């Protein structure tokens, strides 16, 4: 889990990107000081160095569009597979049930 200092640096970098300002350690530190956030002095420089040469706006838009395109691509590919693709999940469900039932018979209990 990210620390509050890390999250503050991320938000500061996003604010700078939204305002189309170059992301530097000094500017991140200035934003954090203006927000009265206590932070270790290495965090702003670390985030600025990590984001150096990275188009943050493009990164954000490509991540969000990739997540929404995934289900659409899967739905488009499903009709091409036809009935054999539909039969495979039914077999795997039956296999899971029999495997789950066999695990129940083993007698392993938490408090035995």
Swiss-Prot record:
Pfam families documented for this protein: Ribosomal_60s
UniProt superkingdom: Eukaryota
Gene Ontology annotations of biological process type: cytoplasmic translation; translational elongation
One Gene Ontology CC term in the entry: cytosolic large ribosomal subunit
Annotated spans, Disordered: 71-112
Chain intervals with Low complexity compositional bias: 71-90
Database matches in HAMAP family: Ribosomal_L12_arch (MF_01478)
Function as written in the Swiss-Prot or TrEMBL entry: Plays an important role in the elongation step of protein synthesis.
Protein name: Large ribosomal subunit protein P1
Species name: Oscheius tipulae
């Amino acid at each position: 889990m990210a620390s509050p200092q890390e999250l503050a640096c991320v938000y500061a970098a996003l604010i700078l990107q939204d305002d189309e300002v170059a992301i530097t350690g000094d500017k991140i530190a200035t934003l954090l000081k203006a927000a009265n956030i206590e932070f270790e002095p290495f965090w702003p420089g670390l985030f600025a160095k990590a984001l150096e040469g990275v188009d943050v706006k493009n990164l954000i838009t490509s991540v969000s569009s990739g997540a929404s395109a995934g289900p659409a691509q899967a739905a488009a590919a499903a009709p091409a597979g036809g009935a054999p693709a539909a039969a495979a999940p039914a077999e795997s469900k039956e296999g899971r049930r029999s495997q789950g039932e066999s695990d129940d018979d083993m007698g392993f209990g938490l408090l035995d």
